[in-house]
């Protein structure tokens, strides 16, 4: 290592102080570490560094002469280049300009109005704004287009170009008119102050100074600083040239220079660079050109412009960093775009890719290859698709169709898909509801029959909210109300179902009892009905089921007429004798009596057929001329027996037996007296309710009104009532032939008082049952005779329930009140 010489004040050491290898390495390291700060941006410099350009201009002509001499000397004697370092070992002794004179009128501005705007500071000319907005510079654009070389050209009649490979340092200048060193340095400093368009890249750093149109004519110097090197290369001696600049350069001017001149200049420069390599290491400016004392932006005091303030320098540095970042992003985007491209043969068929989101037709960067003019054949793929499904469609942006046509077809296809799916869903829903219509509740079916509901339009949601307690065409109930009503309905239905089960059970049991009692009757007849034990069973059977039609006449005759037929043979008239009297003596039949008979038949509340009517009239004629004459109830007894199908002889016999035993005069008198007894059973029940106060009267409660009750019951119930009355009027006795001889001379009144049972209680209990349980639609028993013939005391609740159940209920209630007597 050679020790550095001490240098005087105001002087700069030459390159001879440092060896060539060390000098080259120092220049390279300095270039890599701080060149981006000193040359590119013009910041972080000391004031003394501004002297470099002044000294460089002073030695411009001398350097050119030395370069020519060195070239000639190397041509004749290549070995003489070794002494060049000793000849150039001298000190630059130019005095720097007076700093006080420069900064007299360049104080820092005190307001924002005096500060240059960003547009003034950061733009060289009007043409550079477009490049700055894109984050690029003239040199950057030139680098993007060429990628291998860097070119700098100035046009002013003569063109000089310095083209070097990437990684070299170059500084070129084209000179038009010779000027003094001092003036050229001054002009250069003035022009350097207009440096604004500066670009950074990863490989190079360039500073370009162009003459502003408003500058004076004398300041026509242009400096181009190219510092791309980070490879340790030295600067060529001819890299610093001062020329007179022609008009402003633009991006197009760089690319439109004379190719011949540029190639020739490039060849000359290459030869010169190769010959001057040893001299470069010993040149006085080789080490001082890129020293830390060299300013990138000289002071603007010479041309009357203010220097950059710290804030302006900060804004300049921030703008340069932003441009550098934009340039880096652009380079990376281009890299990834290149990497993302696919070969032309690897692209898929557009007809098979239709559901992938794509860009609009204006995006031409999607594909670089030329597409086919014809539309791809999709016939083969279309055969596999449904006509209503989404057909294949071209990728937007790569087919020769407009956006409107593409989206119209897509809209039609989507509409067709939606309409078809909607039609299929509707069809399936209607089919499902049609098949499930039979499973809907009865409320919907009844409403459909009435025209209030369409079963096809009943959905599951409607079925879930519709309640059976309200018609389906009305608004649905509230949730709580529906739950409460459904709970009550379930309770009522459960009770009704229980009652229905009980009714069915009772009906079944009644049928069993009916069969059992019929068999018991056969046994009782065989054993004898007038026995005391037999009569108890007979009464029980009468209250439970009644007598059968086949054995009813026999039971009546045996119980009421005794085993020897005493009443019918001794106290009743013979029908043959009565018929002879009518034919012999009463032809024609007396009109007064006949009118009375017709009235009895007409007042009956039963429809009477003509055949039954003639028989009934004949029976009534016999009864009218008989010993006891016509009595209350004869017409009803004879009519119901006729309905049973008995012959006239049997009917005559049974009707007279009932009138002489069950409804005789003693029974009628006791009925009238007991029913009006206020202390009796009927009186006590009627006094409990004040509504019966008016009805408790002899006009309404008598034997005549009793038959009004029997006239308002059905035939089956009437016969059942007669069975009970006959059974309750039966008497247990053993009739013998001796008793028969003793009764031969006994009249009817004596026989009645001695051997006939008088049971008025069964009749009074029947009237009480009607008054208390079936008092509906009439005011009193006398009013019953005035009601229409269709009125019945006991009738079925509905048509689905058999009336026999109501008859059974009537008999049970009657038995209940009969037990009170």
UniProtKB/Swiss-Prot annotation:
Keyword Cell wall biogenesis/degradation: yes
Signal peptide: none
GO cellular component, as recorded: Golgi apparatus
Gene name tied to this protein: SBE2
GO biological process: fungal-type cell wall organization; protein transport
Lineage: Eukaryota, Fungi, Dikarya, Ascomycota, Saccharomycotina
Location(s), subcellular: Golgi apparatus
Biased composition (Low complexity): 20-36, 60-74
Superkingdom to which the source organism belongs: Eukaryota
Main location group: Golgi
Name listed for the protein in its UniProt record: Protein SBE2
Pfam family, one: SBE2_N
InterPro entries, A to Z: Sbe2/Sbe22_C, SBE2/SBE22_M, SBE2/SBE22_N
Family note: Belongs to the SBE2 family.
Region (Disordered): 1-151, 169-188, 264-311
Keywords, ordered alphabetically: Cell wall biogenesis/degradation, Golgi apparatus, Protein transport, Transport
Free-text function comment from the UniProt entry: With SBE22, is involved in cell wall integrity and polarity processes like bud growth.
Polar residues bias locations: 75-85, 125-136, 170-186, 264-291
């Amino acid at each position: 290592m050679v020790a550095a010489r001490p240098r005087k004040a105001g002087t700069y050491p030459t390159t001879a102080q440092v060896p060539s290898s060390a000098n080259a390495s120092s220049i390279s390291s300095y270039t890599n570490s701080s060149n981006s700060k000193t040359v590119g941006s013009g910041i972080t410099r000391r004031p003394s560094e501004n002297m470099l350009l002044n000294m460089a201009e002073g030695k411009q002509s001398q350097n050119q002469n030395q370069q020519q001499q060195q070239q000639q000397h190397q041509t004749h004697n290549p070995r003489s280049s070794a002494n060049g370092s000793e000849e150039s070992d001298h000190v630059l002794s130019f005095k720097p300009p007076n700093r006080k004179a420069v900064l007299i009128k360049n104080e820092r501005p005190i307001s924002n109005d005096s500060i240059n705007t960003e547009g003034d500071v950061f733009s060289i000319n009007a043409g550079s704004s477009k490049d700055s907005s894109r984050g690029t510079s003239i040199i950057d654009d030139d680098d993007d287009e060429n990628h291998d070389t860097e070119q700098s050209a100035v046009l002013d009649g003569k063109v000089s170009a310095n083209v070097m490979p990437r990684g070299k340092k170059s500084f070129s200048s084209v000179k038009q008119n010779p000027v003094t060193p001092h003036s050229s340095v001054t002009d250069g400093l003035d022009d350097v102050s207009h440096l604004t368009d500066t670009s950074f890249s990863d490989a190079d750093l360039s500073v370009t100074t162009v003459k502003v149109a408003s500058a004076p004519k004398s300041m026509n110097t242009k400096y181009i600083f190219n510092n791309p090197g980070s490879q340790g290369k030295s600067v060529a001696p001819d890299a610093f040239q001062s020329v007179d600049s022609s008009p402003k350069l633009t991006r197009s001017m760089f690319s439109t220079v004379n190719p011949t001149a540029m190639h020739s200049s490039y060849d000359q420069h290459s030869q010169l660079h190769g010959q001057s390599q040893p001299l470069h290491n010993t040149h006085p400016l080789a080490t001082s050109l890129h020293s830390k004392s060299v300013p990138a932006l000289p002071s603007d005091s010479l041309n009357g412009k203010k220097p950059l303030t710290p804030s302006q320098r900060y804004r300049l540095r921030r703008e340069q960093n932003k441009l550098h970042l934009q340039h880096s992003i652009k380079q990376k985007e281009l890299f990834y775009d290149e990497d993302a491209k696919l070969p032309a043969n690897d692209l898929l068929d557009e007809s098979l890719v239709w559901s992938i989101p794509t860009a609009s037709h204006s995006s031409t960067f999607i594909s670089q290859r030329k597409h086919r003019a014809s539309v791809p054949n999709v016939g083969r793929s279309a055969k596999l698709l449904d006509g209503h499904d989404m057909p294949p469609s071209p990728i937007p942006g790569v087919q020769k169709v407009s956006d409107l046509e593409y989206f119209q077809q897509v809209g039609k296809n989507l509409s067709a898909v939606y309409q078809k799916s909607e039609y299929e869903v509707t069809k399936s829903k209607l089919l499902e509801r049609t098949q499930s219509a039979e499973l809907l509740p009865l409320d919907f079916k009844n409403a459909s029959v009435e025209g209030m509901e369409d079963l096809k339009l009943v959905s599951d949601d409607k079925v879930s909210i519709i309640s059976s307690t309200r018609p389906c065409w009305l608004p649905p109930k509230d949730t709580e109300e529906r739950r409460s009503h459904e709970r009550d309905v379930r309770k009522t239905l459960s009770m009704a179902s229980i009652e229905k089960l009980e009714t069915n059970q009772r009906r079944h049991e009644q049928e069993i009892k009916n069969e059992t009692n019929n068999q018991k009757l056969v046994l009782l007849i065989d054993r004898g009905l007038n026995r005391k034990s037999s009569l108890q069973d007979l009464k029980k059977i009468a209250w439970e089921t009644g007598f059968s039609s086949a054995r009813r006449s026999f039971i009546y005759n045996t119980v009421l007429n005794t085993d020897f037929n005493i009443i019918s043979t001794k106290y009743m008239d013979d029908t043959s004798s009565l018929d002879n009297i009518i034919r012999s003596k009463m032809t024609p039949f007396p009109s007064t009596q006949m009118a009375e008979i017709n009235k009895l038949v007409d007042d009956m509340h039963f429809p009477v057929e003509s055949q039954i009517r003639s028989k009934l009239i004949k029976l009534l004629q016999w009864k009218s001329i008989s010993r006891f004459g016509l009595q209350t109830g004869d017409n009803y007894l004879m009519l119901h027996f006729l309905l049973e199908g008995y012959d006239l002889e049997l009917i005559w016999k049974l009707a007279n037996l009932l009138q002489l035993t069950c409804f005789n005069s003693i029974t009628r008198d006791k009925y009238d007296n007991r029913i009006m007894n206020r202390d009796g059973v009927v009186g006590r029940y009627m006094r409990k309710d004040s509504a019966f106060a008016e009805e408790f009267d002899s006009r309404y409660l008598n034997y005549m009104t009793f038959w009004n009750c029997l006239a308002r019951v059905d035939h089956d119930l009437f016969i059942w009532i007669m069975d009970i009355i006959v059974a309750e009027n039966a008497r247990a006795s053993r009739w013998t032939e001796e008793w028969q001889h003793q009764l031969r001379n006994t009249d009817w009144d004596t026989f009645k008082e001695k051997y006939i049972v008088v049971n008025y209680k069964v009749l009074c209990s029947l009237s009480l049952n009607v008054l208390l349980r079936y008092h509906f639609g009439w005011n009193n028993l006398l009013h019953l005779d005035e009601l229409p013939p269709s009125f019945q005391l006991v009738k079925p609740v509905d048509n689905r329930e058999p009336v026999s159940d109501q008859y059974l209920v009537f008999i049970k209630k009657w038995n209940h009140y009969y037990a009170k007597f």
